[in-house]
């Protein structure tokens, strides 16, 4: 058995509940749970859904499990749904609505999560959406709930969850589209604003917006320099969807790609610009950003530049120094720093 996370261990110690003809696992984690679930349901159809491309890549070769990474769940016949509770409450509310549009009338919903994820809010969140609820078990700082007689929805339309918002940087203003689960949902964060205020001026070429979120960086630069073309990447299918909507709304030419770090990125760029992520799920995780910085140079043209913003306390300068002959700190205050190669 692969190493299992505490939420998965809690599910498996209640294995009598893990039975269904068509089982959907939402927001699964990178452990051995899907394989264990298939062992207990060898004849069942099991679908594993995630918004996260890295999780999808981890699980894609699990025998007997269909893995889907997308911005919404499709189907209509799931009689058991297992939801790993996400840290974003707007995201969980959207996911619950999506789930209620793809289940059978007699479906059961199991919700598991760590206490620190906010999972105990689930009973309140489903008060008017399920007629029956039960706290099944708790252990290892995790809780498992069961819900039945869920109120089905006839359809799910992600456009109902669009959140348009205005982005103002320097003398530029535009409208962006966000959806739940996207970084800093519905707002321009301070770090990205500082990055854009200190972005280099390039007249033409191709730009990589790494960790694109709602596509704010590419849109701002594209409005400043219409000759630029963009590749926007993110590990989140929700971010890719939001970026696509924002680019389209502002007539910016570019493509949005799912990628775990730089793994799906090809070619070289005249500018790589990013507010790189340092959270994975609930936990703080610098691995993605550090790996990105260590490998960004090979994706730059000879005269290409790297521009990033980071919290001032993060130890990125030694990594930059190891990769680039010269880099500059173009902005720094007590919270943020902008680095340029």
UniProtKB/Swiss-Prot annotation:
It comes from the Bacteria. Its EC number is 2.1.1.172. GO terms for cellular component: cytoplasm. Keywords: Cytoplasm, Methyltransferase, rRNA processing, S-adenosyl-L-methionine, Transferase. It catalyses: guanosine(1207) in 16S rRNA + S-adenosyl-L-methionine = N(2)-methylguanosine(1207) in 16S rRNA + S-adenosyl-L-homocysteine + H(+). It is found in: Cytoplasm. Specifically methylates the guanine in position 1207 of 16S rRNA in the 30S particle. HAMAP family: 16SrRNA_methyltr_C. Belongs to the methyltransferase superfamily. RsmC family. GO terms for molecular function: 16S rRNA (guanine(1207)-N(2))-methyltransferase activity; nucleic acid binding. This is Ribosomal RNA small subunit methyltransferase C.
């Amino acid at each position: 058995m692969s190493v299992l996370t505490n939420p998965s261990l809690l599910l498996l110690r209640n294995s009598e509940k893990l039975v269904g003809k068509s089982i959907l696992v939402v927001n699964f984690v990178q452990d051995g749970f899907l394989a264990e679930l298939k062992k207990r349901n060898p004849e069942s159809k099991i679908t594993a859904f995630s918004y996260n491309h890295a999780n999808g890549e981890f699980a894609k070769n699990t025998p007997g499990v269909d893995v889907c990474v997308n911005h919404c769940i499709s189907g209509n016949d799931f009689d058991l749904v297992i939801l790993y509770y996400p840290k974003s409450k707007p995201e969980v509310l959207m996911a619950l609505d999506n789930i209620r549009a793809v289940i059978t009338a007699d479906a059961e919903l199991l919700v598991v999560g760590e206490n620190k994820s906010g999972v105990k809010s689930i009973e309140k969140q489903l008060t008017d959406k399920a007629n029956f609820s039960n706290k099944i078990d708790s252990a290892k700082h995790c809780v498992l709930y069961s819900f039945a007689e869920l109120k089905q929805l006839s359809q799910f339309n992600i456009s109902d969850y669009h959140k348009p918002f205005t982005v103002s940087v320097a003398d530029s203003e535009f409208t962006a589209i966000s959806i739940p689960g996207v970084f800093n949902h519905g707002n321009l964060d301070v770090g990205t604003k500082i990055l854009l205020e200190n972005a280099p001026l390039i007249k033409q070429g191709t730009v990589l917006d790494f960790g694109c979120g709602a596509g704010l960086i590419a849109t701002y630069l594209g409005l400043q320099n219409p000759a630029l073309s963009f590749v926007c990447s993110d590990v989140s299918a929700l971010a890719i969807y939001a970026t696509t909507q924002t680019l389209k709304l502002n007539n910016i030419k570019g493509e949005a790609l799912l990628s775990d770090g730089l793994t799906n990125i090809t070619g070289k760029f005249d500018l790589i610009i990013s507010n790189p992520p340092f959270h994975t799920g609930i936990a703080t995780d610098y691995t993605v950003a550090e790996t990105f910085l260590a490998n960004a140079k090979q994706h730059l043209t000879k005269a290409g530049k790297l521009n990033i913003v980071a919290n001032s306390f993060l130890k990125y300068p030694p990594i930059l120094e190891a990769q680039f002959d010269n880099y500059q700190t173009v902005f720094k205050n007590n919270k943020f720093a902008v680095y340029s190669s």
